[in-house]
Amino acid sequence: MAHKKGVGSSRNGRDSQAKRLGVKRFGGQFVKAGNILVRQRGTKFHPGANVGVGSDYTLFALIDGIVKFERKDKQRLKVSVYPVIEPAQ
């Protein structure tokens, strides 16, 4: 038998809430202006054409269109939104 009662410390028992970061709209998806594309800490993804940056580095679409993930240079990725070109009738 244990001679000490198992006691938790008051220093335990804290855990931060998950922040739900990551890509919210993937390449090839249609988005509307204002849709959030990526939630991130810092600029893991950089803004490309027709993409704005929030104060917390959130990337969002400035126009309706199709999302495209592309290389900015060897290390950096950028996210762009291109308008949908409808065929002439």
From Swiss-Prot:
GO biological process: translation
One of the record's GO cellular component terms: cytosolic large ribosomal subunit
Keyword Ribonucleoprotein: yes
Gene3D superfamilies: 2.40.50.100
GO molecular function, one term: structural constituent of ribosome
Keyword terms: Ribonucleoprotein, Ribosomal protein
Coiled-coil region(s): none
UniProt KW Ribosomal protein keyword: yes
Domain of life of the source: Bacteria
Pfam families referenced in this protein's UniProt entry, alphabetically: Ribosomal_L27
Range of residues in the leader sequence: none
Family according to the record: Belongs to the bacterial ribosomal protein bL27 family.
NCBIfam families named among the record's database cross-references: L27 (TIGR00062)
Classification via PANTHER family: LARGE RIBOSOMAL SUBUNIT PROTEIN BL27M, RIBOSOMAL PROTEIN L27
Protein name: Large ribosomal subunit protein bL27
Species this protein is from: Thermodesulfovibrio yellowstonii (strain ATCC 51303 / DSM 11347 / YP87)
